[in-house]
Amino acid sequence: MSRLQFQLQTTDGHARRGRLTFPRGTVETPAFMPVGTYGSVKGILPEQIRALGAEIILGNTFHLYLRPGLDVIGDHGGLHGFARWDGPILTDSGGFQVFSLAHRRKITEQGVTFSSPNDGARVFLGPEESMQIQKVLDSDIVMIFDECTPYPATEDVARRSMELSLRWAQRSRQAHDGLGNDAALFGIVQGGVHPDLRSRSLDGLQAIGFDGYAIGGLAVGEPEHERNAMLEHLHPRLPAERPRYLMGVGRPEDLVEGVARGVDMFDCVMPTRNARNGHYFTSFGTVRIRNAKYERDLDTIEPGCGCHACSSGYTRAYLRHLDRCNEMLAPMLGTLHNLWYYEKLMADMRAAIAAGTFVEFRRSFYAARGATTPPLPGESS
């Protein structure tokens, strides 16, 4: 039996306010999970992540398996001890990383053989191997091993990929249970941008039975309207009593639109990666600090922001100077700001859902950016 408990507390339209409870802590939803690919969120300490409001982080099964390897992580009792993070951790299965190595991989019914991006060695990964790795990592949420359907993909290609993922889902479930792992196991809905395939995938996953359901194969190049259409299609079909996780998404707008369509959990490298490239998120849009107009700008990234960078008074001019000099303090401060912004955005959405004012929140979110609020299904533009 899984250690995860999920409580759906209230809804506002399709937006959902809930709580995930694990032995290692609780996670208020909707939630954004900072990504710690190699066991650390780049440029920030674990205690700083917690102070920003994050309650769960994501680790990367694929990369941690290749380096440092399971022996080293096992010596620490798992990923929590290795990374010095005592809260819940979700680990992906390695499926997306295999997808990203298209030119180095060979997919068969058994699994995937690929060349390691580290040293070129041949490596095999299948559902059983992924479940074994995640058992050693001792994550709180384990993801099934699947094939991420590329975009664009014909319906036939997407169907064959989805059917393979379903067979792998069954093997993942059996391997996970066979290991006696009481961590939560999430299924992953595939099917590209084809509604019928998405329905078939979800039906197959529910027949197997999972603790939560992720929506995969999106944020891989498809237009935003197609992504939203898939979320709208799945919302009434997903079990209300299980958490829903939109993988690899995304921009602040994507989070708002995902929540509006019933998503509970998100992850993305965007806030940390963009910080390292001098792009800082604010309520009025993105500050691109390398722009010359910030050379003598005495404002903070966002006046009134409570992050360490803004509350300490670091100016845009100073951050631009650090960035131009390749000083490591620039991405550190930028990461603190961006993750604070993301976590506050999620907290504000949770509060709006609880208060029954999510529609107003969404309008204000776009108005602050000088943008028109996109209509939801059933609304006029």
From Swiss-Prot:
Its EC number is 2.4.2.29. Pathway: tRNA modification; tRNA-queuosine biosynthesis. GO terms for cellular component: cytoplasm; cytosol. One of its GO terms (biological process) is tRNA-guanine transglycosylation. InterPro entries: ArchSynthase1/Queuine_TRR (IPR050076), TGT (IPR004803), TGT-like_sf (IPR036511), tRNA_ribo_trans-like (IPR002616). It comes from the Bacteria. This is Queuine tRNA-ribosyltransferase. It comes from Xanthomonas campestris pv. campestris (strain ATCC 33913 / DSM 3586 / NCPPB 528 / LMG 568 / P 25). The gene is tgt.
